[in-house]
């Protein structure tokens, strides 16, 4: 039944007429609560009325038999469907629930209703979240170029909304500005993207306990090159190459500059005692300084030298640079926050080495694995005495190890991670991004105190757990930045990760595209993902487009550098298509000679903690044939050439092998002496006789036959030998053992000669059956010929088999073999008995019988007689024609 309208309902609020329409939330209702109460009453009334309808079954079928009830149900059902369709149209859902021509099944109508309810409830939840201030649909901030900027159609919506929405919209446009000046263009030193090892940038080593190598000093960097061939190479790298050429290693200039200091570092006793957490100051009460000049950087370094600990964090950008750029550094002390513009002070950041390498000052990082490498790569900065809160969180077995979780756990602060992937190259930085960067280090020192306290309590008031965290942090400080080095086999690593099979042409295209991408990225100082992403490169290699437009079709969106150099890429694809097409190769199949095995496998098998003798071969590749381990003789900078290996007696890998019953190696003349144990084993093996070899002679006559057993009537061997006649006893008795090899050679030669003669005789003497039949009929006045040509062929085949069997049985030497001449044979023997009953089957190749019936004989003779000049008189080499029966 239809619910009563608001106008007809008696419980409508009486105050609706007294209040003006402007103050009403809905027409006839002053506030939302009154409307909810009224709507709830209507829903309850409708539910109660629907419950009073006849139930589906016998009762409903009975009422359905009355026309009035049927008409009432159809009318009310159409009203309900019409209302539901309007609601669905209002919410943008499919509203063809009333159209019986489109939706006829009840299940389909129910599915439409369920989908509409889901949409409505989802929208209600979104509106409730928006009303309560919780917005779950914040868009993540991505680097510029990844999203298409929104086009402003007109000017009326520029200043729409409240002030907060306006500020948020302006920030969004600022983050995704398309035109950003590349900061690499303003750097003093040129970025080194060459395909050479990374050279440390440090030239001054403060807090040093071991001096800096001479090759890394500033005097050596500024000194002109002594060798003219090294003018285009940095001085330190030229010295390294020269040392590799002359094999004179003076100092390892590629080692960690603070290796000695970190190896001998011990945490101060003040940090290994029970800490007293010091609460952080409020963000509004803490001063924040933006460092963008050299004087401010020097002042910052002086302040840091007077602190006992400070927190450090970095913001990095890697999408529009080959090696990446460190765009910002955040430093926080107990009383102040600093944000350093590293793009502006890139060449002067080495000043902070004095405070970062001071072993008396604790540097607090969170997840410093990448930060340590970025500091070395861009600024030549190194860290001594670091505490990594990420390692402490792992040691404490927290639920999560992220900084966001630590802020929520220890400080009760909800961090906003929408700027985590922002483009930090933007200058000037907006206020939101500065606030986000500041929060990363502002609370970190308090978290450091709280985690130290928990580690102290977990270690039973002993600094054991604290020392473990400092040890792990020290290992992170020892990490070194390594440049990506391109080789001819670099593409194989990416190819194996894709887990796809490519043929020779596709793999060649993949290799050429990988080399082109690496060269372009280094030259343009762009990342691999910006030049040509991996999935696009693999798609092009799989498709092998014939036209440049096909390359464009494989990329969506098309990278700018691909569009610029489309012709060069097309030439590479054509070069790959000219390769011969081979079968699909697996990633393991194209694996070439790689580096030497890991040094972790080089352990003594006798004293190792694990038994590695039965380890699978997948984890260890030993390319030597004698089970020894190859070791590299000399270190090599470039590994394209063949590396020489040597065998170390202390690193032999062998498995247990029982060689007692193995056959001796007689390749070197058979002079290998046998030990006593091997002689005994040989005697034992000779006593075991194969029963088949005892009465079946081998072709090479190398099988051992027991003479006593073969001539003993009581033995089974004697019975088998007499039954099967497989071995001639007389021949075995007469044949001397000394002449076995000579006899085998003679028999083989005689067998081959007999085969050749038999084949020649058969070819010469074998006359076609039809010609033989024609000759016989002409000379003997057309007597009855052979009954069946197939029988003759079978006889000939049997004779050939008999002759071949005779040829296989060698005759005694000296007896000549002469094949039988079948041309003088009488083939009447194959004609059969004249009294035999003729076959009931008709054979078209069979001649008519030459009897005394007169007419039949004459007709038969006329069939072969002279009819024209084309038939020769006498013999006919073309045989006889078929005699088909008349109808």
Curated annotation (Swiss-Prot):
Its EC number is 3.1.13.-. Sumoylated by USP36; sumoylation does not significantly affect EXOSC10 nucleolar localization and association with core exosome and USP36, but regulates the nucleolar RNA exosome activity in rRNA processing by promoting binding of EXOSC10 to pre-rRNAs. Effects of sumoylation on EXOSC10 levels vary between different studies. Sumoylation of EXOSC10 is required for the modulation of EXOSC10 effects on cellular protein translation and cell proliferation. Sumoylation is promoted by mild hypothermia. One of its GO terms (cellular component) is cytoplasmic exosome (RNase complex). Expressed in ovary (at protein level). Expressed in testis (at protein level). Expressed in lung (at protein level). There is a cross-link at residue 583 (Glycyl lysine isopeptide (Lys-Gly) (interchain with G-Cter in SUMO1)). Its cofactor is Mg(2+). Mg(2+) 2 binds at residues 313, 315, 440. The modification Phosphoserine is found at residue 823. Component of the RNA exosome complex. The catalytically inactive RNA exosome core complex (Exo-9) associates with the catalytic subunit EXOSC10/RRP6 (via its N-terminus). Exo-9 may associate with DIS3 to form the nucleolar exosome complex, or DIS3L to form the cytoplasmic exosome complex. The RNA exosome complex interacts with cofactors C1D/RRP47, MPHOSPH6/MPP6 and MTREX/MTR4. Interacts with MTREX; the interaction with MTREX mediates the association of MTREX with nuclear RNA exosomes. This is Exosome complex component 10. It comes from Mus musculus (Mouse).
